[in-house]
């Protein structure tokens, strides 16, 4: 957390009003994915629109044998992620300064995302980046979403599995927070 406080004073990586709830709103929220899914050795996960490194950094710590590529279109955020990963000696994280549509050279077992775009767009960007996986992790798009998702899911024409995070973590913050999983078929 101290690393993020220091970087946030220079570059607005995380909303300043959110820093007092850093663990709950960012770390624990990201780790809700680990409460639902396991990622295996040598699986490759893309964190699309990683922002300050969430959910990618907490997941990479939790799954040290899984490879994570954290991508964002804002270069200053990628700079922060590189510094954080180096400071905590996180060897299974690489970064890419890129928009989702511009990633053409990789195939991943899983794409994860948090607070980036509507499901329709996330699936459109993610699907070409996914490969059929033989690993134990989720093979498809896993995203963290909030609020009433009825319209967003309908407009996406996806049929994701949906888990209520509040059933995993009792904190008030997690009411109306969900994990969505759209499998690659």
Could you say what each language-model-derived stretch is?
Residues 1-41, 46, 76-93:
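Class I SAM-dependent transferase core
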Residues 47-51:
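Conserved S-adenosyl-L-methionine
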Residues 52-65:
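Conserved SAM-binding loop of SAM-dependent methyltransferases across substrates and taxa
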Residues 67-72:
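Conserved SAM-binding motif I beta-strand of class I
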Residues 101-110:
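A short acidic, Gly/Pro-enriched loop at the edge of an enzyme's catalytic core
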Residues 123-139:
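A short glycine-rich, Lys/Arg-flanked "PGG" loop and its adjoining helix->strand segment in the class I
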Residues 134-150:
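Conserved beta-strand signature within the Rossmann-like core of class I S-adenosyl-L-methionine
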Residues 147-185:
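Active-site capping/gating segments
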């Amino acid at each position: 957390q101290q690393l993020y406080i220091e970087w946030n004073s220079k570059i607005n990586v995380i909303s300043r009003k959110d820093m007092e709830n850093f663990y709950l709103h960012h770390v624990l929220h990201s780790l809700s994915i680990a409460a639902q899914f396991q990622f295996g050795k040598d699986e490759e996960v893309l964190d699309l629109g990683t922002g300050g490194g969430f959910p990618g950094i907490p997941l990479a710590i939790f799954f040290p044998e899984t490879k994570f590529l954290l991508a964002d279109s804002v270069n200053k955020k990628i700079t922060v992620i590189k510094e954080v990963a180096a400071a905590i000696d996180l060897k299974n994280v690489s970064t890419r300064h890129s928009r989702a549509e511009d990633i053409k050279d990789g195939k991943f077992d899983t794409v994860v995302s948090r607070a980036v775009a509507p499901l329709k767009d996330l699936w459109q960007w993610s699907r070409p980046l996914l490969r059929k996986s033989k690993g134990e992790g989720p093979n498809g798009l896993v995203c963290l979403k909030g609020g009433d998702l009825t319209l967003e899911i309908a407009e996406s024409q996806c049929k994701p599995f949906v888990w209520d995070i509040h059933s995993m973590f009792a904190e008030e913050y997690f009411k109306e927070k969900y994990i969505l999983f759209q499998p690659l078929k």
